[in-house]
Amino acid sequence: MPTSTETIELSIVMPCLNEAETLAVCIDKAQDYLERSGVVGEVIIADNGSTDGSQDIARAHGARVIDVPARGYGSALMGGIDAARGQYVVMGDADDSYDFSKLDPFVERLRAGDELVMGNRFKGGIAEGAMPPLHKYLGNPVLSWIGRVLFRSPIGDFHCGLRGFNRQSIINLHLQTTGMEFASEVVVKSTLGGLRVSEVPTTLDKDGRSRPPHLRSWRDGWRHLRFLLIFSPRWLFLIPGAVAFFLGLIGTLFISFGPIILGDIGFDVSSQVYLAALTVVGYQSVLFAILTKIYAQHEGFRIPRSRNFDRLERRISLESGALVGLALFLVGLAIGIWQFFAWAGEGFGSLDPSGTVRTAVLAALLMMLGAQTIMAGMFLGVLNVGLKRDR
């Protein structure tokens, strides 16, 4: 235990919910590391409401217990991190699947200036039976690959439970998630925030519990995937939306001049209606991606930028949105008025329904796109007012 005059360098934080079977050995390994290495540190057990006496076991083995009433993996860890007194924090599960006596690689990288040091179980070795095949061959590799692609992260194992970080750097990220997706949030926000990130090989042993783990494969896997997608508007909204918008718009315009025949397949009014709907959905998705990215960048998240987007952001405003939207709306309205006078010229009699509907769909589409653009410009104006006030 550090004396009252010693500055604590390392806090080893373990989330805990009924870990009486394995908690003692985890704490002993952590204490052994601190004693052997000479690192001035502490062991913190962030207890999430254990009813099996885990708190008493932790105190008996020299750990500091922090009661965290808010349930969840992320909640427990943030409670422990907030209470930590060390410059650095190493966090890991209290189920004896990670070896807390071998933390030298993490501490070395942290002392070298890295702000997040991730363990990589696939490089260090996974003991037989330590990880379900679904997680080993599908869940972890696929989700980690998605994370690397979406956020250009160098991390190969997004969900390793053993990781170290500079405490203040992580607190500055303002982490929010309370469940298992906390593991992904740390990596994603560290990457977007420009933190110095690295990884070291680590091992994963079969945990020592006789009960099932807290992890729920499909539920928690979905939470990880959902978080990754929400923080990547480019892949979730922009690219799919742009594809839908251009396909729908081109199809709508072509059919407005007459049916399209491809072999034995004909595309006419009914196809045009669906293509117009696809255009509207795609356009809304693109607008949402742009607004989301602008908001995220104003909030300090370092989402990868591009020159084209920077130029677009400078040109987008309430006024420009209103002008472009009004122009689209008026063009659509003009087509509708022209169609009305054409009908009047026929004495308000019967018209070719196919040709009439094709023109009406195009006019309605332009009016809807115009209205959406005006509303997006107004929302951006409100957003900018709110951001300026926050500053």
Regions from the PLM with identified roles:
Residues V68-A83, Y88, F100-M180, K206-F227:
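Acceptor/aglycone-binding surface of glycosyltransferases and processive sugar-polymer synthases
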Residues S37-I44, Q55-A83:
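Conserved donor nucleotide-binding strand/loop of the catalytic core
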Residues E19-T22, S50, Y73, D99:
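Donor nucleotide-sugar binding loop of glycosyltransferases
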Residues D47-Q55, D96:
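A conserved acidic beta->alpha catalytic loop
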Residues I27, Q31, G38-G49, I66, ...:
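Short beta-strand/loop segment that forms part of the nucleotide-sugar
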Residues M1-D32, V39:
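N-proximal low-complexity "stem/linker" segments adjacent to membrane-targeting elements
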Residues M1-E6, R152, L175-R391:
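Hydrophobic helical membrane-anchoring modules
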